[in-house]
């Protein structure tokens, strides 16, 4: 088994966006962390990954809808029970609204339990006359701007595993132990409508859901499906020492799976066809996503499909588009049309966050809620015009009442950003903005 894993990946390939570990990637510190990770139990199981792959195949055919959400970058300090519960609660609330109005299952995926690393535009950060390594996520170094905090530490990869294990333990408890009961989720949504300044717009939608639940209760319908949900984990496969160390051979099928998460995606900055990240993704059997930005071409998309899904396996391949509101209607049609004409079946997911980031005068990175919604709207418009399926959304969000994105029903302004800006990296939709987005997307699903 060990020799199979050791010989699985192509050696000598360039791996973009990797940390500059002290002593190098072959140093004693990295080897020690990797050996420890290799000895640890899987965080997820191959059968769960295959289950998710089957659901992705349904979403690609328009028979399910993908909802993926969570932090831009998880941090160790924020991996508390309250924070994890609030994120799960937000995703469950969004899913209930989307599922009712689409009348199809919603595949619930957390951008959590592993999203501890981030690619960066620059290796270094300068403040005044001090230059230090850039913060690459808690998997690599610390946000504090000191030499010791910013020095990459491979032992943090072991802490990523331990924190992810604790997070997944809570996720499973919350989603299987009654917390996720659909009737409880509906009561939460009623609370949002009661307390939100835009709640009246969605009151009738919520009342419809309430009447449907009341009817089923009166008819004696009480299925187990009401009481628990299936919830999957995902993160960007970025730090290859971590991902390779957590790749295992499944005892039943004999196939390799990355057991750090159910779903892994390759980012826009690391999807080089001849690079180590695509080589890694091509060798594992998990469902795989790839981010496509505004400069992506049909040729790029088709080459990625050939490399990652040569057998055209249903549910294997997801494209997560991150175009920006100004580009989505111009760039996406050719991509979707070209892939569709090739005969490949992929899931198309809209990431309306990363293409709409800008710096406010105060220096905070932020996003306009209206831009986020406009990109989602453009995504739906393109698929409707082509007769294809808008398969899902990928949202950076938190369950907390932060002030990181401007606009929405709460009318957060650029001057409000400083009041509660907590993200370690990019701005996230807060709880209220996330639910508002879900109600707006539900209207699009109803009319698709």
Language-model region placement:
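Active-site-facing alpha/beta catalytic cores
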Residues: 79-324, 367, 375, 392-394, ...
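Non-transmembrane, aqueous-exposed alpha-helical and coiled segments at domain scale
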Residues: 301-304, 310, 316-348, 354-403
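N-terminal charge/polar-biased segments
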Residues: 1-40, 407-448
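Short, glycine-/Ser/Thr-/acidic-enriched flexible segments
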Residues: 72-74, 112-114, 295, 324-326, ...
